[in-house]
Amino acid sequence: MKKASILLLFFIVVVSCKQNKHEKAQPTAEKIKFTEIIKEDYELHKPSEEIKGVLILFGGYPENADVIKREFQILDIARENSIAELLSNFNQKLWLEKSEKYQLAKKLQDIIIENKLPTENIFVGGFSSGGVVSLLISDFIIGMKQFYIDPKGVFIVDSPIDLTALYKSSEKNIERNFSEPSIQESIWLLEILGNNFGNPKDNIAKYENSAVFTCSTNNISNLKKLKRTKIRLYTEPDTLWWKENRMADYEQMNAFYIKKLSESLIEKGYESVEYIPTIDKGYRANGERHPHSWSIVDKKDLVNWILNK
């Protein structure tokens, strides 16, 4: 698609991120043997022997498995800890239709069965729009008895979780007329959201039915099955960077709505919610400074979370 580069913090979907240069994998005494399986729609790296956990990753709007590997270099740490890693090529989704949820859930379960992966310690996570997919598909799987791959935990990395806010932010960007790329992306977003849901002023319920979170109405109906699931919400609220580079206000940033979501989940009794804001960790794999990046995640800490250490 012409606008496949769309990312979104400031509610514009951007390409992914960079490995945190300060994290280094700790060597193990014994090299764990791994099997690499590459298919058209996914890539799987699994230990040949004991598997202590399964990590399923979804990339940002235009990202496939190769880009995820480049921007989120967690393979070595996962390997050292006997964690299987499934990198999905499923992308370009700001929300999921019910049919898409079913097809994706079935696909994931088929992969897990086919590759004899354990189902008791599955974690799902994603960057940007991939985080939206992660939350929505996890909620769907847990709510459907025919699926038995319930995620034990789910995490997002600076994801555009509020579609209503995304629509309104796009209107601001066009009115502000700050940069041509921003204007073009916002025009595309208004078109795709408007065509599917209309204007949120007139059709807020349609937005609520599809979004992870609608801040203006405090709606989290698409996360109701995750009340006992471990949840991590990563974001880097660098207001100065966004002001200088996009002329974006804090209320236009993914970080603003991620924080609001964490507060709403905790208030409503969700058992294990962690809001994780970072400072100066956002860099792309090419060294470019960008707070909207995979690299804000501490990979070693994430693995410890998966292993419950």
Feature locations, PLM:
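A domain-start/cap signature at the N-terminus of enzymes
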Residues: C17-G53
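Short beta-strand-to-loop junctions in surface cap/lid or active-site-entrance loops
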Residues: K39-I51, Q109, N115-K116, N219-S221
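Short beta-strand element of the alpha/beta-hydrolase
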Residues: I51-Y61
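Mobile cap/lid helix-loop segments that gate and shape the active-site cleft of serine hydrolases
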Residues: P62, E171-L223
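Short amphipathic alpha-helix adjacent to the substrate-entry channel of hydrolases
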Residues: V67-L86
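Alpha/beta-hydrolase active-site loop
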Residues: W95-K116, L136
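C-terminal catalytic histidine-bearing segment of alpha/beta-hydrolase fold enzymes
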Residues: L96-E97, T229-K243, A255-K309
